[in-house]
Design a protein with these regions (language model features):
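Extracellular "spike/adhesin" assembly and maturation modules
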Residues: 2-28
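Short, Lys/Arg-enriched charge-dense amphipathic segments
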Residues: 29-30, 260
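Extended active-site and interfacial segments that coordinate phosphate-rich ligands
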Residues: 32-34
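Beta-strand-rich extracellular passenger or scaffold domains
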Residues: 47-431
């Protein structure tokens, strides 16, 4: 059974203690306060029953690392202030059975503090009016790959971080209208072989908003970082970067069933760190008209993968600096309105080329899917000998070719116009 605790300064021990107010309902007897134990925020590996904070409290954390295996619930519009003035960034470990559960109040952390999840420890902010404020918030797992600690913001809960929020939990979730994580920089990743995989789902109206940067993966990490945006969830930042073993997924991660798309709102998405190539954008959703308007950039030659697995996604940014690889699977469709840089395209699904006026498409295309010229005048100038699918030219659109290699062995279905500008003799034997 949960008990309601109150914090009391212990002069002899020079620390805060948690007292349980045990009230007797027996007629004629007075309630009495009993000091259960000195559950101090300054001791390590302490044990206590769950603590409920239902009135305003202020705690000085100190410089020593601390570990708790009980649940602290903040409710009834209470305000809990934790002052962490030591610049060494002390660590609060939420061990198995422990967690910070903000369900109806506010927690403010003044100064640097690391949250470490061990076993099944958790950090939860749920329900409208529940908020966590911090200058910096480093949320990390315990370094064990099998830990099941989790991070959850749901049902209108909010986290506000002035500078950097670093997430390295095994599982994370931001879900529900009004649920937000707001930070200067939002980072997911671990150094080298430390920690397990990081996974965060932003869904059903939940949001992750960074004023400066969303960063996925670390340059030499050996674990995987996955950020999934689905079912109307939203991430926003001026820049999103993908480093080693990182995946930004619209709908669902690769290998999972497609879901409704979310929203990726960014000015630039950049693939970084040239020594590794395992970084990708996954398009795996059920929408017919999803859009990514960011400019997609390869920080070094050949970096990055764009994999269209399910649904139709239009890339409407200036992607001239992208030099990675594009894969369109049988149930996927990818639309290009400006360019896709110098990327090579393996098309087993559908490639939509949609020009407002004119477009020169010099990319090398292979596969047996469909190239659809939807609008404008599109000049196919690349070496597409390995393409054996179909080329559809919509009514009002114009496809321009100059050599036989531009259309490979494709069959053609022309409702608009096919313009051939040949500067040498060649046999046109495409169906």
């Amino acid at each position: 059974m949960n008990k309601i605790y109150r914090l009391k300064w212990n002069r002899s021990r020079n620390c805060w203690s948690v007292c349980s107010e045990l009230g007797s309902r027996v007629k004629g007897k007075k309630s009495r306060a009993v000091l259960i134990s000195a559950i101090s925020l300054y001791s390590s590996l302490v044990f206590a029953d769950d603590v409920i904070v239902n009135q305003d409290k202020t705690i000085d954390f100190g410089k020593e690392n601390q570990s708790i295996d009980y649940r602290i619930t903040v409710t009834d519009n209470a305000n809990l202030v934790i002052n962490t003035t030591d610049t060494s960034r002390p660590r609060l470990t939420l061990a198995s059975g422990g967690g910070l559960d903000i369900t109806g109040g506010k927690v403010t952390i003044n100064g640097p503090l690391n949250f470490l999840l061990k076993g099944t420890g958790f950090l939860n902010v749920s329900n409208a009016g529940s908020e966590l404020y911090a200058d910096d918030l480093y949320e990390s797992n315990s370094g064990m790959r099998h830990d099941q600690g989790y991070f959850n913001v749901s049902n209108g809960g909010k986290i506000h971080v002035k500078d950097t929020s670093r997430l390295t939990y095994t599982q994370g979730n931001v879900s529900g209208e009004g649920s937000q994580v707001n930070a200067g920089t939002f980072f997911m990743g671990v150094y080298g072989g430390y920690g397990g995989n990081q996974f965060l789902s932003v869904n059903n109206g939940g949001e992750v908003n960074a004023r400066e940067h969303i960063s996925l993966g670390y340059y030499d990490q050996r674990s995987d970082t996955t950020l999934v945006v689905s079912d109307g969830g939203k991430i926003s930042a001026p820049k999103i970067s993908l480093s080693t073993n990182s995946e930004l997924a619209l709908g669902a991660q690769e290998g999972s069933a497609a879901k409704a798309a979310g929203i990726i709102d960014a000015e630039k998405i950049e693939f970084v760190w040239a020594k590794t190539s395992d970084k990708k954008i996954t398009l795996n959703h059920t929408d017919k008209n999803a859009t990514i308007s960011a400019d997609i950039v390869s920080g070094s030659e050949g970096l990055g993968y764009i994999n269209a697995l399910n649904g139709t996604t239009y890339l409407t940014g200036d992607n001239s600096a992208f030099s990675g690889k594009v894969k369109i699977e049988q149930n996927g469709a990818l639309g290009i309105t400006q360019n896709i840089g110098t990327a090579e395209i393996n098309n087993r699904g559908k490639l939509h080329l949609k020009a407002d006026d004119s477009m020169t498409f010099a990319n090398k295309i292979s596969g047996n899917g469909t190239i659809s010229i939807d609008s404008g005048t599109v000049a196919l100038t690349g070496n597409n000998y390995a393409f054996s699918g179909y080329i559809d030219v919509a009514s009002g659109a114009v496809a321009v070719i100059s050599e036989d290699k531009n259309i490979g062995r494709a069959d053609l279905d022309v409702d608009g116009k096919l313009q051939i500008n040949a500067n040498k003799d060649w046999v046109f034997d495409n169906d």
